[in-house]
A protein has these predicted regions:
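Active-site beta->alpha loop and helix N-cap motifs at the rims of alpha/beta catalytic domains
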Residues: 2-117
């Protein structure tokens, strides 16, 4: 469990690293895992003390559920608990918030962020 002392320094608000075709409404699996891994490594290497994802760039309404799961689990996998990781589960309704929380089971995340869209 994290304490207040574990959260200090720079919190990197990470975007969803998207595939080149992510803007196409027919696109699926639009999380670019290679870019995501490189981005997380760079953020940590550049001094980020905490990482937060799916919470500040509109992912709550732009990612499909399988894309959300991929982004969260891949971020946790590359992070390897080097820094605290928070994942946003914001949605337009409560049921989806709980579904997103269930999708995080098994991922090494330190906390969730819930906002009102």
């Amino acid at each position: 469990m994290l304490s207040a002392q574990d959260i200090s320094g720079l919190m990197a608000m990470m975007p969803a690293f998207a595939t080149d075709n992510a803007g196409d409404y027919r696109a699926r699996s639009t999380v670019d895992v290679g870019r995501l891994h490189a981005g997380v490594d760079r953020m940590i290497g550049d001094g980020a003390n905490v990482i937060s994802t799916t919470g500040s760039f509109g992912e709550c309404h732009t990612l499909l559920m399988d894309e959300f799961r991929t982004l969260a689990h891949e971020t946790a996998a590359v992070n390897k608990q080097r820094v605290p990781l928070f994942v946003g589960v914001t949605s337009t309704h409560t049921r989806e918030v709980f579904e997103k929380c269930k999708l995080l089971e098994g991922a090494k995340v330190d906390g969730i962020l819930v906002g009102v869209p």
